[in-house]
Amino acid sequence: MLLFALLLAPARSFSQSQPVATDAAGTLIVRARALGLARSLAWRRLLHYRPNAKREPVSQVDGKGFFLAASGARDPDAELDATLRAFSAPLVPGNEDDHALCRFPARRELLDRALHFSGALHAPTCPALAQYLAELDPESVAVVYAANYLNNPASAFGHTFLRLQKQRPAVSNASDDELAYGVEYSANTDTDNPFWYAFKGLTGLFPGVFRFHSFEAKVHEYERGEARDLWQYDLALSRAEVRLLTLHLWELSATHLDYYYLTKNCSYHVLATLEAAAPRIDLVSHLNFVVLPRDTIKALYRVPGLVRTTTYRPSLRSRSLPQVVQREAPRKAPQSAHGSMRLTLGSGITTQYGSSFETIGYRLALHDLSDPPDGEMELLQVQFLDTQFRYDLGERSFTLNRLTFAELVALNPITRREAPLSWRGRAFGMRLHDRGCSDCFAHGLDLGFGATLASDDQHLALFVMADAYVAFSPSLDGIRGSFVRAGVGPYAGLRVRLPGNTLGLLTANWAYLPAQKLHGTYDVRATLRSALSPDVALGFEAALQPDSSELQFASYFYF
């Protein structure tokens, strides 16, 4: 609790005061310029400078108090000069915690390695910083991955955070978890409205902050409260790198970095912070423009020898599953998963116009029930911005065939101990082929709830749901002749994992259409997909609607 009080104290607010330069500061500035420290990778990473579109350095830290120069967010040279001036400024008795040497200990550590000025400057005691370091006193660092959690939109892709392992005191009966701290970067949210939440999260309108937690309490929350499996990756960092990371987290805990749900999120800033502490490692460059938590783990493995050991921590629910499921846990490690994005190329035939077609598709994220299963929760589907275009060779027309904005499916099998609800929800755009909408593109929302029966290893799953949807299209002959269609009815499916990393999925739904000329419609789909590697798959897809049937062969590339 002492640590949390320190990090929330008013004294942690940074100001932009500009101390007057002294002779000592001038000498240090001349030496720093001669050494080119402002251009060094270590300095730029410590202040989170990244090149913008014009290849100019811009810091990703958005709290103004983090910078001592007025132009510091865009000028590494000016910020370095201002830092050295601030380090040389006189102490104010009784207010040492506000001095730059106490506020920016990671900068002090980094610059002293090159300039060796510690003996020439005053040495403030920094009471708050000293208590912080005594409380943490870490000897090692790990990255922890928490599996997907669909009940919280911010965790639909999973979550990553840091574990700081405190050195064990000479006399202590505490467990390692009790001695550890968790450090995460997350958004400071101010709304429960899902639409406003999504808008602010996607556009960087939430400030993102670094928070410290009791690691034991965090594990309890994930493993018991949210039934989320954890994977812990212990890193091979030197003691000097661990210390610099600890000092840098002190600096970051007093500022904010704007939070972007798909890009500058928990995963991105965990890696950027590790790079700041250990400039020898290169992590952020291995990320796509959309950053998902499991991408963090894959990036760690791009640095040879960085991951020292891996520990799987199953949730309470996972520990209650049959042994055959628990034995497959190593295959579910996030570093084994396919790439988050997907490119699809296909060729097929359709009865709609009696011709063949070519398709190209792109999915922003993440996984469907037919994708390669390694590194994934067996019966979970999370998709965002799944787009498919089609060129009809007979009609010589290029059309948008599908646009799934978001689709979440959680098939939770009924067991002897519990009967959890299975559900799915999606915001979609797709082509309808029936008498109420012949080859028209409709947007809609779909929601279903039901039950799932599965084998012990979950390789065979049967699910049934009560489904309801609403669709909109100017071409629809909908409710009382309007452009709105509403439908309710059963939705069912069968998923089977076959030998050789092959998956089969069959889904079917029939919908009653109230107050409409067309009283009912149906949609049946079948997929057979075989993974050649974690990032390449081949497969067949078939679809049947009242006025159309089609079959296509497709190649899938994950990256």
Language-model features and meaning:
Residues 215-290, 460, 471-475, 541-542:
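Active-site nucleophile-His-acid catalytic modules used for acyl/amide transfer and hydrolysis
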Residues 54-136:
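Low-complexity, highly charged intrinsically disordered N-terminal segments
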Residues 137-227, 362, 391-403, 415-420, ...:
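Glycine-rich catalytic cores of cysteine/serine-nucleophile enzymes that process amide/ester linkages
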Residues 336-338, 353-357, 394-400, 416-420, ...:
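Transmembrane beta-barrel outer-membrane domains
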Residues 362, 526-529, 547-559:
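Outer-membrane beta-barrel "beta-signal"
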Residues 347-353, 366-368, 386-395, 407-411, ...:
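Transmembrane beta-strands of outer-membrane beta-barrel pores
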Residues 337-343, 356-358, 376-385, 415-425, ...:
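Outer-envelope beta-barrel architecture signal
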Residues 129, 147, 263, 267, ...:
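Outer-membrane beta-barrel initiation region
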